[in-house]
Curated annotation (Swiss-Prot):
It is an enzyme of class 2 (transferase). Keywords: Glycosyltransferase, Lipid A biosynthesis, Lipid biosynthesis, Lipid metabolism, Transferase. Its EC number is 2.4.1.182. It catalyses: a lipid X + a UDP-2-N,3-O-bis[(3R)-3-hydroxyacyl]-alpha-D-glucosamine = a lipid A disaccharide + UDP + H(+). One of its GO terms (cellular component) is membrane. The gene is lpxB. It comes from Acidobacterium capsulatum (strain ATCC 51196 / DSM 11244 / BCRC 80197 / JCM 7670 / NBRC 15755 / NCIMB 13165 / 161). Condensation of UDP-2,3-diacylglucosamine and 2,3-diacylglucosamine-1-phosphate to form lipid A disaccharide, a precursor of lipid A, a phosphorylated glycolipid that anchors the lipopolysaccharide to the outer membrane of the cell. This is Lipid-A-disaccharide synthase. Coiled coil: none annotated. Pathway: Bacterial outer membrane biogenesis; LPS lipid A biosynthesis. It comes from the Bacteria. One of its GO terms (molecular function) is lipid-A-disaccharide synthase activity.
């Protein structure tokens, strides 16, 4: 192996790309001439990674959506597989996205490439049979939730808890007054965050019920809706249509006053300054827990996806904050329980009662403590392990 290692990176989702984009410069600090290729988003490409496959071309959610797009996803997977066989990378770093990455791990293993997996597949929740692939094809597993370390070690996988990268992200510096001025919000009112997800399908499934809940919570609050930068213009247009319909329905009913929903770009600032938020299950719930302000978790998928998930998911909670705490810290409204009336029931105390807010914030502080690790950052720990694996490969190459 030369001093310019050839590194395969695979990150198929927004959170994975965030971590991948942090790893590229960290590895370049050790290997200035390192070459990166694989699956990733625009940020990773901007940092010099050659994208064999674009993350936006393979990122889908839900079992039914995966099935519908399977031919296209398989075609993109074959591109990645061919690139691995042709280039024989010195190291592979696979980030989350198990439906693709566990298959790539086999190809990499067969090519003799060391495999480092960062952000574990949630095999502890479902599809535990896939642990066999991890045992066979993954050399090191680096996990971001503390209970995952024991799970993998119990199955004979070399696994280490490195802390959650989001614990290292500082709180937004923008003040409440500045945020209010920037978005024409009333600082005298309570603000409620609406976070329906970062994908078009999530917004279609989640936002209408959130809007209905806002109507019931009332116009005496401000509602803040951050939209992910990855949404297409068509998806943003769909959001505008939903908000326009809300205003039109209020005009039709003269006695009604529509809640004011303001679209913004900064989800973290929204979570930081909102009195409480309604958050779709996903990485945003981890961000919300770490920021520490109260929230309610909601989750909805297609009926078929949910029917299958009910049979195979074995964990007692959906919200990661509750899994980490091993108790109910935040409310969960799943599938049929995800209704406007139920949201209002859970949100009203968080908006109106300081005591209810403080009780939840105490639980969220415990979650944050469990996700943190003393010393170096999660990205620094991953970089260190990657460096050790490259050094070991170089030493073996010299022996041969």
């Amino acid at each position: 192996m030369s001093s310019a290692p050839n590194i395969f990176l695979s990150a198929g989702e927004a959170s994975g790309e965030h971590y991948g984009a942090a790893l590229i410069p960290a590895l370049r600090a050790l290997y200035a001439d390192a070459r990166f290729f694989g699956l990733g988003g625009q940020r990773m490409q901007a940092l010099g990674m050659e994208r064999i496959v674009r993350a936006e071309d393979v990122a889908v959610m839900g079992i039914t959506e995966v099935v519908r797009h399977l031919p296209r996803i398989y075609g993109e997977y074959l591109k990645l597989k061919r690139s691995i066989i042709e280039r024989k990378p010195d190291l592979a770093i696979l980030i989350d996205f198990p439906d693709v990455n566990l298959s790539l791990a086999r190809t990499l293993h067969e090519q003799g490439t060391p495999v480092l997996y960062f952000v574990s597949p949630q095999l502890w929740a479902w599809k535990k049979y896939r642990i066999r692939k991890v045992q066979r094809y993954v050399d090191r597993m680096l996990v971001i939730f503390p209970f995952e370390e024991a799970f993998y070690q119990g199955h004979g996988v070399q696994a280490d808890f490195v802390g959650h990268p989001l614990t290292e992200v500082p709180l937004p510096t923008i003040t409440r007054a500045e945020f209010a001025a920037a978005h024409h919000l009333d600082p005298a009112k309570h603000w409620v965050g609406l976070l329906p997800g970062s994908r078009g399908k999530e917004i279609r499934l989640n936002l209408p019920e959130m809007i209905a809940a806002a109507k019931q919570l009332g116009h005496e609050h401000e509602y803040v809706l951050p939209l992910a930068p990855t949404l297409t213009e068509a998806q943003r247009g769909h959001v505008r249509q939903m908000l326009a319909a809300l205003t039109a329905s209020a005009h039709d009913a003269a006695h009604d006053q529509a809640p004011r929903i303001t679209v913004v770009a900064d989800a973290r600032a929204t979570l930081h300054h909102a009195r409480a938020s309604i958050v779709a299950s996903g990485t945003a719930t981890v961000e919300a827990a770490l920021i520490g302000n109260p929230f309610v978790v909601v989750y909805r998928v297609s009926p078929l996806s949910y029917a299958i998930a009910r049979r195979v998911v074995t964990v007692p909670h959906v919200a990661m904050a509750n899994l980490i705490a091993d108790r109910r810290v935040v409310p969960e409204l799943i599938q049929d329980d995800f209704t406007a009336a139920n949201i209002v029931r859970e949100m009203q105390p968080l908006v109106a009662s300081d005591r209810a807010r403080e009780q939840m914030m105490t639980g969220l502080a415990e979650v944050r403590a469990k996700l943190s690790t003393p010393g170096s950052s999660a990205i620094a720990r991953v970089t260190k392990v990657a460096h050790e694996m490259l050094q070991r490969r170089a030493a073996l190459s010299r022996v041969r």
